[in-house]
């Protein structure tokens, strides 16, 4: 994808380089388009450099090689203080409260498109760019819209729903128009060291480590009982924080423990008794709900979509979008009704709304219900 150089030489773009193929190709494309490109490597986590697990040093090594190859200057900045205060402490507090947070969404909101953006502006940047699979469109009035990436399998708009107009107006997502195999092809053609580098998986600061081992360093585990809906003890857990709703693996309960022989799923948590409630079968009512409540709303346009408008939403990243409507919005809390019941709606996770290709924004789930009357009873 060799692009003819436009007269972009007076426009400085600082690219957040992670050491992966996506951000590498982001820098490559902008360089080909004639922008004044600089790279910035963010260190968001302290404590790994002396451990056996040390991805940051390897990533920085790859970033240095990319910058040398593309002949662009590199800034290395430590945002670990901001990350700890704005992302990680919230992550721990949510787990202590029995919820399941999504720190990658908060990292985008508080670090990549806040701390990094602000710092880039002090370095004279006109824009920042990242290797996200999403797109930004602008209308004649300067209003920005967040669109899904063209690669449906890689679309990351779900993780970017918190971005506001100012952040979008200063951001670029050059690979949002491309599909992942082509991104790798471009990297290989340009002889970039990252062309065959494995995609990172899992929560950014945990990486390939075992989640349980990592969390134990910060939160004391409180073992307890796993009970069925009758309150009968059917197993034991090592800590509620290790279980997310709808989880099947790791319960240690044989499928034949109950009468049905169906597999067991974690369905609810009782923080007062430190009990995990498990049910049999993925179609159990405790696992499936048509209503949810959510707060901490972020709308790309700056305001909530029209109530009872036909929308689509998803309650987890890999879920296909589901038809729904927002029934009410009051004091920063919304009530959402789906056309069909959704499995394992999880407090702490985000519900993100779409209208066609456009991501409208989202909110953090606070509860899941079978009816409006059930919501009113809970108030």
Curated annotation (Swiss-Prot):
It catalyses: S-sulfanyl-L-cysteinyl-[protein] + uridine(34) in tRNA + AH2 + ATP = 2-thiouridine(34) in tRNA + L-cysteinyl-[protein] + A + AMP + diphosphate + H(+). One of its GO terms (cellular component) is cytoplasm. GO terms for biological process: tRNA wobble position uridine thiolation. The record marks 132, 349 as: Interaction with tRNA. Keywords: ATP-binding, Cytoplasm, Disulfide bond, Nucleotide-binding, RNA-binding, Transferase, tRNA processing, tRNA-binding. Disulfide bonds join 107-204. It is an enzyme of class 2 (transferase). Signal peptide: none annotated. The active site is at 107 (nucleophile), 204 (cysteine persulfide intermediate). Residues 154-156, 316-317 are annotated as: Interaction with tRNA. The keyword Lipid biosynthesis does not apply. Its EC number is 2.8.1.13. Pfam families: tRNA_Me_trans (PF03054), tRNA_Me_trans_C (PF20258), tRNA_Me_trans_M (PF20259). GO terms for molecular function: ATP binding; tRNA binding; tRNA-uridine 2-sulfurtransferase activity. ATP binds at residues 16-23, 42, 131. The keyword Nucleotide-binding applies. Residues 102-104 are annotated as: Interaction with target base in tRNA. It is found in: Cytoplasm. Catalyzes the 2-thiolation of uridine at the wobble position (U34) of tRNA, leading to the formation of s(2)U34. Belongs to the MnmA/TRMU family. This is tRNA-specific 2-thiouridylase MnmA. It comes from Hydrogenovibrio crunogenus (strain DSM 25203 / XCL-2).
């Amino acid at each position: 994808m060799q692009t003819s150089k436009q007269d972009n030489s007076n426009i400085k773009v600082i690219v957040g380089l992670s050491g992966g193929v996506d951000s590498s190709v982001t820098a490559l494309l902008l360089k080909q388009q004639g922008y004044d490109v600089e790279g910035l490597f963010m260190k968001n986590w302290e404590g790994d450099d002396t451990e056996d697990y040390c991805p940051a040093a390897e990533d920085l090594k790859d970033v240095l090689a990319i910058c040398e190859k593309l002949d662009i200057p590199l800034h290395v900045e430590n945002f670990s203080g901001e990350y700890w205060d704005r992302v990680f402490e919230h992550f721990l507090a949510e787990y202590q409260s029995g919820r399941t947070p999504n720190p990658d969404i908060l990292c985008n909101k508080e670090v990549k498109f806040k701390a990094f953006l602000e710092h880039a502006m002090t370095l004279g940047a006109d824009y920042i760019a990242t290797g996200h699979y999403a797109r930004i469109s602008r209308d004649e009035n300067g209003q920005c819209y967040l669109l899904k990436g063209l690669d449906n399998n890689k679309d990351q708009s779900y993780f970017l729903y918190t971005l506001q107009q100012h952040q979008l107006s200063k951001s670029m997502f050059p690979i949002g128009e491309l599909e992942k195999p082509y991104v790798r092809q471009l990297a290989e053609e340009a002889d970039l060291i990252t062309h065959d580098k494995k995609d990172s998986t899992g929560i950014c600061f945990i990486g390939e480590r075992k989640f349980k081992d990592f969390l134990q360093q910060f939160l004391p585990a409180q073992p307890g009982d796993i009970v069925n809906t009758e309150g009968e003890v059917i197993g034991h857990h090592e800590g509620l924080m290790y279980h997310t709703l709808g989880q099947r693996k790791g319960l240690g309960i044989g499928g034949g423990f109950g009468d049905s022989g169906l597999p067991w799923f974690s369905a609810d948590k009782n923080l007062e008794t430190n009990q995990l409630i498990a049910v049999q079968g993925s179609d159990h009512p405790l696992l499936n709900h048509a209503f949810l409540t959510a707060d901490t709303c972020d709308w790309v346009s700056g305001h909530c979509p029209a109530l009872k408008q036909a929308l689509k939403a998803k309650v987890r990243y890999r879920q296909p979008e589901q038809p729904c409507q927002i029934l009410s919005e009051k004091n920063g809390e919304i009530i959402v009704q789906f056309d069909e019941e959704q499995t394992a709606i999880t407090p702490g996770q985000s519900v993100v709304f779409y209208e066609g290709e456009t991501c409208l924004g989202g909110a953090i789930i606070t509860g899941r219900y079978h009816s409006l009357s059930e919501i009113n009873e809970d108030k």
